[in-house]
Swiss-Prot record:
Name of this chain's protein: UPF0246 protein Vapar_1301
TM segment ranges: none
Alphabetical list of Pfam families matching this protein: H2O2_YaaD (PF03883)
GO cellular component terms, semicolon-separated: cytosol
Length: 261
């Protein structure tokens, strides 16, 4: 069973990573691979073009143009850091990779995947060079008008390879719709289970973006801590007050709810 997460816009290359944490190379990051092909396209654009393409400020555009120029075909401890430690945002606050033991990180490496506009798919310990390229970016390429066309069935096919040894392949989607859309459902040979997180607001339950993002990371963390092997096992998820709501759920859509106070 694999868990899919979205990446984060904000990055942390300052907080030290424990020295005993190993590092691996991303699957699609060969010098002439898909990631390098995208970097080549991005390097052809000016800061103003990047600003318009990604709706960034002048300062952020200049920063990312510099990042594209500095990007190399292979991440090293000097120019990159492990994805689960580099991404910094609500999801990764919930995951809290720094508090996981080496054994837990090893399990996460086998069962947690991070979708990425530039890298396609990352494992938590894959080396990540600084970048900005959201999956929804309309970056024209030889495959089509955007990154969904660029990645095509490649992400789904790689997931199939990762799941090939599982008797009943399952993908647990705790990524945003923008990112999960990059997984070609027709090519994916696995059952997909979606997890939804709702808060009690006023007189009903509803999804609150900030809390939902953190909850996605929390669920991935819980799965790592408990080595969750089936969707049924996820029904016991209970971090930070969430509980499984059987009446609101289906076999393919697990709903977790909580009330404050």
């Amino acid at each position: 069973m694999l868990f899919l997460l979205s990446p984060a816009k904000s990055l942390d290359y300052d907080t030290p990573v424990p020295t005993e944490v190993p590092a691996t190379q991303p699957h699609f990051e060969a010098p002439r691979g898909p990631s390098a092909e995208l970097i080549k396209l991005l390097r052809e654009k000016s800061p103003q073009q990047i600003s318009e393409l990604m709706h960034l400020s002048e300062k952020l555009s200049a920063l990312n143009v510099a990042r594209y120029q500095a990007w190399s075909g292979k991440g090293t401890p000097k120019n990159a850091r492990q994805a689960a430690f580099a991404f910094d945002g609500d999801v990764y606050g919930g995951l809290d990779a720094r508090s996981l033991t080496p054994t837990q990180l090893a399990w996460a490496q086998e069962h947690v995947c991070i979708l990425s506009g530039l890298y396609g798919l990352l494992r938590p310990l894959d080396l990540l060079q600084p970048y900005r390229l959201e999956m929804g970016t309309p970056l024209a390429n030889r495959h089509g008008k955007d990154l969904y066309a660029f990645w095509g069935a490649r992400i789904a096919e790689h997931l199939n390879q990762r799941l090939a040894a599982d008797r009943t392949p399952v993908v647990v989607n705790v990524a945003s719709q923008e990112y999960f859309r990059s997984v070609d459902r027709k090519a994916l040979k696995a059952r997909v289970v979606e997890c939804v997180f709702e808060e009690w607001k006023g007189d009903r339950y509803k999804i609150v973006s900030f809390y939902a993002k953190r909850a996605r990371g929390l669920l991935a963390r819980w799965a790592v801590l408990h080595k969750a092997a089936t969707p049924k096992a996820l029904e016991k998820f209970d971090l930070e007050g969430y509980g499984f709501d059987a009446t609101a759920s289906t076999a393919e859509r697990l709903v977790f709810r909580r009330k404050f106070g």
